Amino acid sequence: MTQSEAQAPQAPRDAVGSEAVIVAKDVHKWYDNGFNVLKGVSLNVYKGEVVVVMGPSGSGKSTFIRTFNALEPYQEGSIEIDGTLIGYDIKDIEAVRREVGMVFQQFNLFPHLTVLKNVTLAPQWVRRWPKAKAEEIAMRLLDRVGIAEQANKFPGQLSGGQQQRVAIARSLAMQPKVMLFDEPTSALDPEMVREVLDVMRNLAKDGMTMVCVTHEVGFAREVADRVVLMDGGVLVEENTPEAFFNNPKEERTQAFLSQIL
């Protein structure tokens, strides 16, 4: 398989929509030192689809998904989120960021604010919601992720898994069309991983469009519509979970899986 064939966006399965919410075409990115971290990556993500991105350290996977909300700029190619081009127009970038939620390895919660205030801050300032509406939605979301009883505590009083669930609720409070997850369980103790993955599973069942950088193979097998392998700044292979894990086409994919399975 050639690189261009490997990177040709695949059509979604019948279970997801036909509307592409994310359209990335031939995306290139260089760092200031000249390092080419993304080398012409193309990927479509469809409404309601869950795409898991895997790859070794330094493969460009986290950088790639961070271009989807302009946390990382790119120099060539194009990225559209729900029809809005991410370019240099600050209004377009702000519009995209309102529609794209992101959860990181670290929780990035404000330590001096309660859980409830962490979740309501952005909707009040960015969406201009009144306090009562923001708090009502926040409590509903905290209940959804299983920590409504922690609403008046501070982040430092919570476990890592609880803090990550607050971070997910905070992103959902903006009512995004897309959720990005950048290795959301990698900083957690093993016994806390499941509670975060359960929240992500429920989001997928509810039809949230999701792009997840993770090496949680069980989650990918169960929840993903497609699994993508990146290495060296290129998309090596993308396929259904069954084909990706049981019958990978590329030698690089086979070698990678031999190290994590």
Model-found features: residue ranges?
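ABC family nucleotide-binding domain
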Residues: 17-241
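Pre-NBD coupling/linker segments of ABC/ABC-like ATPases
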Residues: 1-16, 253
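Intrinsically disordered, low-complexity regions enriched in polar/acidic and amide residues
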Residues: 2, 6-9, 104, 149, ...
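C-terminal boundary and immediately downstream tail of ABC-type ATPase nucleotide-binding domains
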Residues: 2-3, 229-231, 238, 242-261
